[in-house]
A protein has these predicted regions:
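Short, extreme N-terminal segment that most often corresponds to the first beta-strand
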Residues: 1-34
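Charged interaction segments
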Residues: 26-32, 44-129
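Surface patches in mature domains of proteins
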Residues: 39-41
């Protein structure tokens, strides 16, 4: 039986001017779908090498991400990043929390919240400090 982890996170990034998508992806991680899993390098224990390069990733792919830029370039609330999805064979609150904190610490984050449900283990909510 598979272990499923459900994630829904939203980040409000403040800045003067637009934050390039490439900079956001470099910190948050790349999306990988099921087909893309064959292009990832694995170690001798079948663990993903360079995990920090990707969004949190399960056995069928990573979480998904949408980036929205405020068309009003004079507004401090410049960008929102939404990260969501279901991870198969993944059951770690701690890894998601570590990833969430890394994302929050890398930008001027006005607000961020992440709800994680690990089936059979409950729900945890993380917020930026």
């Amino acid at each position: 039986m598979s272990q499923w982890t459900h994630v829904n996170a939203s980040f409000r990034l403040d800045s003067i001017g637009e934050i390039p998508d490439e900079k956001i992806i470099a910190i948050f991680g790349e999306c990988v779908d099921y087909k893309g899993m064959s292009n990832i390098e694995y170690d001798e224990n079948y663990e993903v090498k360079d995990k920090e390069k990707y969004l949190p990733i399960g056995s069928e792919g990573s979480l998904e991400m949408n980036i929205w830029h405020n068309p009003d370039k004079s507004c401090m609330a410049s960008t929102t990043v939404s990260v969501f999805g279901d991870l198969r064979d993944y059951g770690s609150f701690d890894e998601i929390k570590k990833w969430f904190n890394k994302c929050c610490d890398s930008f001027f984050v006005r607000q961020a919240i992440c709800q994680v449900e690990v089936e059979g283990a409950g729900i945890k909510i993380f917020q930026n400090n």
